[in-house]
């Protein structure tokens, strides 16, 4: 079973959710477009104001954790549950899991991919990266580190080699 914190972070602020209501209470109606969260607009606010980012995290992170716990409870007892948590270190969850695999890449590649994927300029991408734990912090908590500087196929090959090692632990 795969539990992806980024997917859950979107889910907990869908229209009609308590999460979206809390975001609107804090940031105002201007973060909405047609009743839905305007992520680029909210991103511009929170990545230029550390206190605003912390406020958003205080709203979203507990809701994501609760939803992740709910999904894990629904898994079969013999299921291997894989959590994808981009902000694992920042949210203090590194000790909550049996094994930690960090997918790592060099900072320049990280910036380039973030700019391409999200349509950000360099300054916006740097602000987002600066809000995250550093590379050394992430790799320090890892049991295994995968190199994501290559192609998706190369990363998939690393995962395929690691999976039997992880599966043997269950």
Q: What role is predicted for each listed range?
A:
Residues 1-15, 25, 29, 131-140, ...:
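N-terminal polybasic phosphate/anion-binding patch
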């Amino acid at each position: 079973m795969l539990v992806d914190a980024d997917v859950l972070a979107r889910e907990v602020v869908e229209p009609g959710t308590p999460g979206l209501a809390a975001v609107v209470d804090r940031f105002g109606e201007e973060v909405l477009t047609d009743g839905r969260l305007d992520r680029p607009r909210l991103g511009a606010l929170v990545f230029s104001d550390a206190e605003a980012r912390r406020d958003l995290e205080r709203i979203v992170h507990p809701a994501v954790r609760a939803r992740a716990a709910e999904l894990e409870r629904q898994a079969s007892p013999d299921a291997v549950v894989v959590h994808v948590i981009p902000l694992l270190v920042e949210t203090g969850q590194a000790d909550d899991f049996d094994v930690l695999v960090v997918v790592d890449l060099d900072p320049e590649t990280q910036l380039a991919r973030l700019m391409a994927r999200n349509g950000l300029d360099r300054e916006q991408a740097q602000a987002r990266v600066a809000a995250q734990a550093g590379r050394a912090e992430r790799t320090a908590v890892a049991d295994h580190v995968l190199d994501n500087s290559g192609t998706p196929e190369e990363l998939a090959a690393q995962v395929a080699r690691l999976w039997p090692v992880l599966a043997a632990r269950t």
